[in-house]
Amino acid sequence: MKAIIVLLMVVTSNADRICTGITSSNSPHVVKTATQGEVNVTGVIPLTTTPTKSHFANLKGTKTRGKLCPNCLNCTDLDVALGRPKCMGTIPSAKASILHEVKPVTSGCFPIMHDRTKIRQLPNLLRGYENIRLSTRNVINAERAPGGPYIIGTSGSCPNVTNGNGFFATMAWAVPKDNKTATNPLTVEVPYICTKGEDQITVWGFHSDTETQMVKLYGDSKPQKFTSSANGVTTHYVSQIGGFPNQTEDGGLPQSGRIVVDYMVQKPGKTGTIVYQRGVLLPQKVWCASGRSKVIKGSLPLIGEADCLHEKYGGLNKSKPYYTGEHAKAIGNCPIWVKTPLKLANGTKYRPPAKLLKERGFFGAIAGFLEGGWEGMIAGWHGYTSHGAHGVAVAADLKSTQEAINKITKNLNSLSELEVKNLQRLSGAMDELHNEILELDEKVDDLRADTISSQIELAVLLSNEGIINSEDEHLLALERKLKKMLGPSAVDIGNGCFETKHKCNQTCLDRIAAGTFNAGEFSLPTFDSLNITAASLNDDGLDNHTILLYYSTAASSLAVTLMIAIFIVYMVSRDNVSCSICL
């Protein structure tokens, strides 16, 4: 006879735990924050560069002016500005200009006293305009000016295109024709003759020489007085009689006399005046200028193109929003100078890899994400970890990481806006001081740069603070997302961890990270299937009744034994029974 006994064994599985976590990194970087000082992070975005010196170049996307008149050979920019006979040419329009002459000279024309007037500024003033043209007609009739008639003087040291005696096109050397006598101050009005609403730059001056030459030319050996006035700006001069070295300061031809040259800027419709005595250089052709061209000290030739022109470093291509090193004026799409290197956090706080189960124990590993990070979050900063019989599984939450990246991008954009505002502020200051572009107070400029540098550094510190502090925000969002997905299939045990009622291996965790997790799918195998075992009993002389008798006897004996043991324990606990053990 054969009997079958069916044994039902229910095998339950150990629960897994899922936690939110942060990635780890083996190459920490350091950023500065507003309140935490220096903090190690998993990644940074360098915001500064230290440039090296290079040649000057043309600014990208705009016309850059080197020499005022590129086609005027053997001419300085001052020659062009004064209208030297052999230096008459077209000045091309430009949005940017290079101040390449440290000390302007006239290159063989009449010697000028550079230390007496604003003559050095004249070429620089013209460089500051985008469009520059010389008028086709004279602003006044010099021959018939008050105190005349005059002969228009020329000089062999200022030859014209035919190598005859000549003089500057912007001025007429008014030498009395017949009445070579002393005169009281005379006044001439200078009208506005530009036709396109431009600024009118009117050049004028006076001649000084030895007493002998002054009497010969003008009939008066005494110092002469001169005054110019335009737009509320008045300038006074008294001529010097004699005492000039034979060799000119600019290396030109030997001369006993000198000329002093000045200019005045007349706004549209405004009339200027010149009060003069003998030896006056009356204005003739005038410059009509419009638009703005940014000016910077540099050198020629211009080679290639660059984003930025920097007085100390030459042509720069902008790779970072800020730079460290030597501060100086710059034009174009330039980085802003800051005192120290700046870095923006591009990741999370640095955490060493969390220890695994065998090193720290089960509950130690669960808490690992609080003080350590998890390796394996490919392309992600925040994510999930699963701990169980399968070991440790890790998956990145790319959406959360993207949100963190978006916040960093927003911080970068905010810093860029701050950069643009500061650049506009600097440009505005440059425009306001346009007419004295070479006279900017370096101390004031450095103070402005220091202030802007401090503002930018503080903005970066605050940005880093916000990025690092946002980790808690991202982890809390992940925790809410995880709790919603797990639903009733898990129990919240705190600290961003959940104990599941089912297994959660790498596949399960990947689906959670991807947002495709279905609790029902993984909850089905919470209990293993019933294991049904068939026991075959052979006929060896025992009948069914005998077997049942043995089974019932054993079960009854076990029940009685348990009851007696429980009774003894109860009596001992009530002190009704004592037990002594003797050896």
Swiss-Prot record:
Residues 16-551 are extracellular. Glycans are attached at N40, N74, N160, N179, N246, N317, N346, N505, N531, N544. Residues 1-15 form the signal peptide. It is a single-pass type I membrane protein. A lipid is attached at C579, C582 (S-palmitoyl cysteine). One of its GO terms (biological process) is fusion of virus membrane with host plasma membrane. The record marks R360, G361 as: Cleavage. Keywords: Disulfide bond, Fusion of virus membrane with host endosomal membrane, Fusion of virus membrane with host membrane, Glycoprotein, Hemagglutinin, Host cell membrane, Host membrane, Host-virus interaction, Lipoprotein, Membrane, Palmitate, Signal, Transmembrane, Transmembrane helix, Viral attachment to host cell, Viral envelope protein, Viral penetration into host cytoplasm, Virion, Virus endocytosis by host, Virus entry into host cell. Disulfide bonds join C19-C497, C75-C87, C109-C158, C504-C508. It is found in: Virion membrane; Host apical cell membrane. InterPro entries: Capsid_hemagglutn, Hemagglutn_HA1_a/b_dom_sf, Hemagglutn_influenz_A/B, Hemagglutn_influenz_B. It comes from the Viruses. HAMAP family: INFV_HEMA. Binds to sialic acid-containing receptors on the cell surface, bringing about the attachment of the virus particle to the cell. Plays a major role in the determination of host range restriction and virulence. Class I viral fusion protein. Responsible for penetration of the virus into the cell cytoplasm by mediating the fusion of the membrane of the endocytosed virus particle with the endosomal membrane. Low pH in endosomes induce an irreversible conformational change in HA2, releasing the fusion hydrophobic peptide. Several trimers are required to form a competent fusion pore. Major glycoprotein, comprises over 80% of the envelope proteins present in virus particle. The extent of infection into host organism is determined by HA. Influenza viruses bud from the apical surface of polarized epithelial cells (e.g. bronchial epithelial cells) into lumen of lungs and are therefore usually pneumotropic. The reason is that HA is cleaved by tryptase clara which is restricted to lungs. However, HAs of H5 and H7 pantropic avian viruses subtypes can be cleaved by furin and subtilisin-type enzymes, allowing the virus to grow in other organs than lungs. Homotrimer of disulfide-linked HA1-HA2. This is Hemagglutinin. It comes from Influenza B virus (strain B/Singapore/222/1979). The lineage of its organism: Viruses, Riboviria, Orthornavirae, Negarnaviricota, Polyploviricotina.
